Design a protein with these regions (language model features):
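Intrinsically disordered, low-complexity regions enriched in acidic/Ser/Thr/Pro/Gln residues
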Residues: 2-7, 11, 151
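Extended low-complexity intrinsically disordered regions
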Residues: 9-52, 56
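Mobile acidic interaction elements
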Residues: 16, 20-24, 71-73, 77-81, ...
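Structured beta-strand/loop patches that form or line metal/cofactor-binding pockets in enzymes
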Residues: 49-72
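Short connector loops at helix/strand junctions that flank enzyme active sites
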Residues: 61-65, 75-77, 92-94
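A short glycine/serine-rich beta->alpha loop
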Residues: 79-88, 124-129
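Alpha-helical support elements that line or immediately flank enzyme active sites
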Residues: 94-104
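C-terminal binding/interaction regions
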Residues: 108-113, 117-151
């Protein structure tokens, strides 16, 4: 019997599958370096959010202060914007993975991403369970916003 966590690349959107595969191809210490690269790649907030931080939602499950906003554009493409302090590279890396991996997908494609995706990228031994839970919470919040139609 197949478990939920044994998903194949074809079940994931291409960007998320590529990100997962990039991590899994590396030895554990190098996975942390890749996570730091993602942290450095977290895009700046667009001015409409940077100038109005009250529009962002805090992800309280994260140990570091993470704020995010999910929107769906006129072409029905999802965009996830997040901000996290530079002193929290793990959290920034997770936010960046989701921002890059979900960007441009349809709402249904995002909703179809397995909830356990954060557990499948090969970091469960390298970072604390609390940190993985933070990434899981970011994904869950994104999905909740889309389900509520508030994105």
């Amino acid at each position: 019997m197949a478990e939920c966590s044994s998903m194949t690349a074809t079940e994931l959107p291409a960007k998320l599958a590529e990100i997962r595969d990039d991590f899994l191809e590396l030895e554990e210490p190098d996975r942390l370096l890749l996570l730091l690269e993602f942290a450095d790649e977290l895009p700046e907030l667009p001015p409409r959010y940077a100038e109005h931080p009250d529009l962002l939602e805090r992800v309280v499950e994260c140990q570091s202060p993470v704020f995010m906003f999910v929107e769906v554009d006129d072409d029905s493409a999802v965009h996830l914007y997040a901000t996290a302090p530079r002193e929290a590279p793990t959290t920034r890396g997770f936010a960046s993975i989701l921002s890059q991996g979900l960007d441009g997908l349809s709402a249904q494609e995002v909703l179809d991403v397995p909830d356990d995706y954060p557990n499948t990228i090969g970091l469960t031994k390298a970072v604390s369970p609390l940190r993985i839970r933070g990434m899981t919470a970011m994904l869950a919040r994104t999905k909740r916003r889309l389900r509520e139609g508030t994105a």
